[in-house]
Amino acid sequence: MTDFIAAMPKAELHVHLEGTLEPEHIFELAQKNGIELEYDSPEAVIAAYDFDDLPSFLKIYYAGMNVLITEQDFYELTYRYFERAAADNVRYVEPFFDPQGHTSRGVAFKTVIDGITRAQADAAENLGVRSRLIMCFLRDMSAESAMEHLEMAKPYLDRLIGVGLDSDEKDNPPLKFADVFAKAREWGLKLTMHCDVDQENTVSNIWDVVTKVEADRVDHGVNSLEDEALCAEIVTRGLGL
């Protein structure tokens, strides 16, 4: 059965590019870019992933991405992921990326997206892995910042399939970003939002994502199982979780 599953062609519809950065690569880029890390070894980074809650996970997630500085860094991050995906016979991917996590550190939006999309093109040609990119907004940043980054993305709309929403959900409900997502839909982009597991007001947030934002997909959303009417609405709309 393991061999059968390994040989199956696959699609990956939920992967955070920055989250695919491997510990050894973190240290390699930190040394190259002169970035000081709070971890003294790749093994310490791995140990930090023994987290208890979403904020603890996000702490290590953002610490890792700080080593990404140049266009080549983003290229290597992305292409190395595609190499691993190809080894698992993944044929199509819709990866997320978090531009605010980089522009807030002084890395230009163009640097980020050019490195990622160059790797996408090479992976399609060399590895047979096709992909379309989803730009995520960080929900613990302001709606104004999200709108600014949507405007930054306007020259690159042909490189995106959609927009998403991730990061810490506490006090950051989906409707905080309703206007941003409405604008993205006007521009022809698909919509998805994270509704992580067992977060504050999770079920009501999923209702808002489904019926008010009218997203095309819900990331995670497993707490919908607590509400039969919500499950029925998701089925009626044909949404993927």
Question: Residue ranges of each PLM-predicted region?
Answer:
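Metal-cofactor-binding active-site regions of metalloenzymes
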Residues: M1-L191, D198-S204, V210-D219, N223-G240
